[in-house]
């Protein structure tokens, strides 16, 4: 039956940035589909753990500050997932930050912080997970891109650079790892009602201009990403490699 292809029973997923918002929603979605969940964040993942446990799935919190994490730290996180939960089948690289300033005034510190979390840590976590997935002959990696993987944006040069990089690395890794049984794809969320967009939503003029361009007529929510995440994490997407799927209420069609 086709619906069985979307089940994740017996699978284990590692989700970064799972404390709240999109990451919490993604972790919950995979648990609802049957997966055990490891949540990597700086802390405070008890609420996410409660949602996972409510689905009668196992939950493993992993404390890690991606602003400072080295490739060795990320390799250790993957090894802990395998040691404590038995395997790693799915990685969702959701953790990310944004800094806003005009390009002429943008600081090196803000540039480096964004690039380290959004791009460098993402790549080396892909690498660490793929080493394990290649050995077992299968795996699903889902990177969280952005509309700014396709567009330039305003006042967010490092974020745009990092998310353009996420899309590029997703395609590059798909080229290398498809033959190893690893699917690497990405989801590009639109304007979501999360902490990253709080400043935009608090600006009445900017918020109205954004909503006027979205055919769906509303801000997105973590619930809107669940279907795409489960699809990409499941065997239903076995022939999909290197895709960057917009979930944006139609923003990119305008």
Regions found by a protein language model. Name each.
Residues 146:
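Residue(s) in the substrate-gating loop at a strand-loop-helix junction
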Residues 19-21:
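Conserved glycine-rich cofactor-binding loop
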Residues 77, 102-103, 107-115, 210:
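Substrate-binding pocket helix/loop in short-chain dehydrogenase/reductase
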Residues 131, 175-179, 238:
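Alpha-helical segment proximal to the catalytic Tyr-Lys
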Residues 1-4, 151, 230, 241-254:
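Short C-terminal tail/terminal secondary-structure segment
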Residues 106, 151-161, 172, 197:
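Active-site loop-to-helix junction immediately N-terminal to the catalytic Tyr of the SDR YXXXK motif
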Residues 126, 162, 170:
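Active-site helix of classical SDR
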